[in-house]
Amino acid sequence: DIKVTNNSWPDYVFEENYPIMGIRNYGNYFEKYKHLPGMPTAAEIKAQDGFELGAMQVKLLEKVEEQARYIVELQTQIDELRELLTTKK
């Protein structure tokens, strides 16, 4: 077993004041740069001869939590559109 000790955990992603990129900007970012915002590029990892496992684990969890926020946001939009459709019938 590998135990990584890290005092920083990305629960801050769920704080109201956490700045999350708009979903269209998010898509535009990785279309342009070919990696997720806030994540190192393949070239950066290669230049550093690898990465720190604990720090990368935190970044990956941060991205998972951001994805959860996007999913909830999209579901809210879907629900609102469904409501509009049912009231128009």
Predicted regions, residues:
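C-terminal intramolecular chaperone/autoprocessing and neck/assembly modules of extracellular spikes
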Residues: 1-56, 77-89
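Intrinsically disordered, low-complexity regions enriched for glutamine and histidine
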Residues: 55, 65, 73-75
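A broad "ordered helical/assembly scaffold" signature
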Residues: 26, 32, 64-70
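A detector for long, heptad-repeat alpha-helical coiled-coil rods in eukaryotic scaffold/tether proteins
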Residues: 53, 57-60, 67
